Design a protein with these regions (language model features):
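Extracellular and secretory-pathway beta-repeat/beta-biased strand scaffolds
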Residues: 1-191
Length: 191
């Protein structure tokens, strides 16, 4: 079955183990990491674990190949995971994501924006869809964001004391204002 492959670490200190197995482990010792992948999918018996220093740590994962991401297995992290794939992202009915925060986007994000905590996403003008038919479970106070040209959420999203954002457009900013509220701004010309 499909598992993430072709990792290229762009930023941060990361070791990846479990290649060619059903259980991929990504150990991150820096607060942030950026990883470009040739492909990033998880088959229904597969599991990917991101281990980070804390729940405030984050990893930007960008697919540079031509295949969509299908999450049919388990994606776990004690920290925040951002998955960007312009070819599309789908969490199937068997897929389970458990993280402190999770963002799936078909819009792109610049490395420098991520490293400076700017959650700015820009599409290519015809961004593909993000679909959730599975379960996204966010730890207390975190956020789940699905961002794409089209969003379909027929699955389950739990973010106790946290925020859920569904954004459809070609330019989206996630804004965490002082009280922890999440605002999704889509420029008016996109509406």
């Amino acid at each position: 079955g499909e598992m993430p492959s072709g990792a290229s670490i762009q930023s941060g200190k990361v070791t990846i183990s479990g290649h060619e197995t059903d259980h991929l482990i990504i150990d991150q010792s820096t607060n942030k990491s950026i990883i470009n992948w040739n492909s990033f999918s998880i088959h229904n018996k597969g599991r990917v674990d991101f281990n980070m220093p804390s729940s405030a740590s984050s990893s930007l994962n960008r697919v540079t190949g031509s295949t969509p991401s299908t999450i049919a297995g388990q994606l776990n992290s004690n920290g925040k995971v951002i998955l960007i794939n312009p070819n599309g992202v789908a969490i199937t009915k068997n897929g389970v994501v458990k993280t402190s925060s999770f963002t799936a986007s078909t819009l792109g994000m610049k490395n420098e924006d991520f490293l400076k905590d700017r959650m700015d996403f820009i599409g290519n003008g015809k961004s593909k869809s993000v679909q959730n038919k599975g379960k996204i479970i966010i730890r207390d106070g975190g956020h789940a964001a699905l961002l794409g040209g089209q969003i379909s959420n027929s699955g389950f999203v739990s973010a106790r004391l946290g925020r859920i954002a569904l954004g459809s457009g070609e330019k989206i900013t996630l804004d965490f204002v002082g009280d922890g509220l999440l605002s999704v701004s889509v420029p008016s010309e996109q509406l």
